């Protein structure tokens, strides 16, 4: 390893970046798990799966709202984030997933079969696709929020 590479120290571009990157996976996992429990409910008709979906969607929305706030702060504060890196695509996909899941939460409050089949499951599928698309934008640019300084002499 060359000397210049060994001396580089990664620095976070802003204070909200680590918060967002820690919070972002939680709603994605909750939304995917809600889709899985919707599929389980449609296959078994056990009311337990409907209640699992409700709780997973609620948890995803609560943590997702915190992540969305951190993303908005970072997005508005950093021109580099808006023009490159994550960009508008990530923002639209993540906020879209949250909006779809908000509607899905209201649909899931209906008791019984109609809460999931077909509307609730359709909304869960759409939200899962949007959330996975937002995850995909993170890997498009692998070092979005990390900047390297030149070594001090």
Regions found by a protein language model. Name each.
Residues 32, 39, 69-72, 102, ...:
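Hydrophobic residues within the alpha-helical transmembrane core of Major Facilitator Superfamily
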Residues 73-95:
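Loop-to-transmembrane helix junctions at the membrane interface
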Residues 102-122:
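Membrane-helix boundary connector in multi-pass membrane proteins
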Residues 16-24, 42-63, 86-90:
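Transmembrane alpha-helix entry/boundary detector in multi-pass membrane proteins
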Residues 1-28:
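Cytosolic juxtamembrane helix and N-cap/initiation of the first transmembrane helix
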Residues 145-153:
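Short, highly charged, low-complexity non-transmembrane loops/tails of multi-pass membrane proteins
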Residues 63-77:
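Canonical alpha-helical transmembrane segments
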Residues 129-146:
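Membrane-water interface at the C-terminal end of transmembrane alpha helices
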């Amino acid at each position: 390893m060359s000397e210049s590479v060994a001396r580089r120290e990664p620095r976070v571009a802003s204070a909200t970046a680590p918060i967002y990157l820690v919070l972002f996976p939680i709603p994605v996992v909750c939304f995917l798990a809600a889709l899985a429990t919707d599929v389980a409910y449609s296959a078994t008709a056990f009311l337990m799966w409907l209640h699992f979906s409700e709780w997973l969607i609620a948890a995803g929305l609560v943590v997702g709202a915190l992540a969305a706030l951190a993303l908005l702060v970072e997005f508005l504060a950093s021109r580099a984030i808006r023009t490159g890196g994550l960009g508008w695509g990530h923002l639209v996909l993540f906020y879209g997933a949250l909006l779809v899941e908000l509607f899905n939460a209201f649909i899931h409050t209906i008791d019984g079969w109609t809460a999931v089949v077909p509307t609730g499951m359709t909304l869960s599928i759409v939200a899962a696709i949007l959330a996975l698309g937002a995850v995909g934008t993170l890997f498009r640019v692998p070092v979005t929020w990390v900047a390297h300084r030149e070594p001090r002499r």
